[in-house]
A protein has these predicted regions:
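Beta/alpha (TIM)-barrel catalytic core signal, keyed to glycine-rich beta->alpha loops juxtaposed to Asp/Glu
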Residues: 107-222
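Short, acidic/polar
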Residues: 21-34, 79-94, 115, 138-143, ...
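N-terminal binding-site loop/beta-alpha segment at the start of enzyme catalytic domains
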Residues: 1-67
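Acidic-and-aromatic substrate-binding clefts and catalytic sites of carbohydrate-active enzymes
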Residues: 21-24, 44-52, 76-81, 109-112, ...
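Glycine/small-residue-rich loop that forms an oxyanion/phosphate-binding "nest" at active or ligand-binding sites
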Residues: 72-121
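Acidic (Asp/Glu)-rich catalytic clusters
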Residues: 5-6, 34, 54-66, 88-97, ...
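Conserved, mostly hydrophobic/aromatic
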Residues: 16, 33, 41, 53, ...
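Short, well-ordered coil/turn segments that N-cap beta-strands
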Residues: 9-14, 37-40, 62-67, 96-100, ...
């Protein structure tokens, strides 16, 4: 497993995203992923699967300290009480006392960014989350967030067909990481002739080549 070192924390560079996984299929996918070596599981309140994720982790019988769990606060909960209660609910469903990383899932026009980040920092101090971050923040808003709190991550859509250089530049300035979602562009890479040719040359699939392209970049996870 490749790890990214951020703020003296070792974060697995490859994780299992659980968007669109529900119920028994989600539980089994999480348990199976852990059994073959995955150590980063990503979920969110909006996915409506935290309970199944928690059961999958329990079924895997892994030491909690050996697993990195990320969840996200939905944009309708971006208030002090919403974030506090939302994370408490997530922890209950996940059957854990803490997550490793809590993210603001999407920015909201009506959010008080300082209050949101202050609340996340308080929850961090209470041990409810080890690290804090954001998701789907454009470069300018990411810069503002970093000026207010020690956010370590921005989770955004990133793949060979979507340029995220502006976001990457901000992340690089502050030694933050990018976590890529939709890393294989919803399957588009599977039909990419250039990637198919490269795969034949190196004995790899287009998916493997794409994931390698992502994680070989500095402080990029997928």
């Amino acid at each position: 497993m490749i790890y990214i070192d951020i703020n003296q924390e070792k974060i697995p560079a490859l994780g299992l995203g659980t968007f669109n996984l529900k119920g028994e299929a989600c539980r089994d996918s999480v348990a199976d992923a852990i059994s073959i070596g995955y150590r980063h599981i990503d979920t969110a309140k909006m996915y409506e699967n935290e309970e199944a994720v928690g059961q999958g982790i329990k079924d895997a019988s892994i030491d909690r300290d050996n697993l990195f769990v990320t969840t996200k606060i939905w944009h309708t909960d971006l208030s002090r009480s919403g974030i506090t209660e939302g994370l408490a609910d997530s922890l209950h469903k996940l059957q854990t006392d803490y997550v490793n990383l809590a993210l603001i899932h999407w920015p909201s026009e009506n959010m008080d960014l300082r209050e949101c980040l202050d609340t996340l920092m308080e929850l961090q101090q209470q041990g409810k989350t080890q690290l804090i971050g954001v998701s789907n923040f454009p470069a300018a808003l990411l810069q503002e967030a970093r000026s207010l709190a020690p956010v370590i991550c921005n989770q955004v859509e990133y793949h060979p067909y979507l340029d995220q250089s502006a976001v990457l530049n901000v992340l690089g300035e502050h030694n933050m990481m990018l976590t890529a979602y939709c890393p294989i562009a919803k399957g588009e890479v599977l039909q990419d002739e250039q990637l198919i040719v490269l795969g034949e040359k190196y004995g790899k699939s287009p998916t493997q080549i794409t994931l390698r392209w992502l994680v070989q970049q500095e402080n990029v996870a997928a």
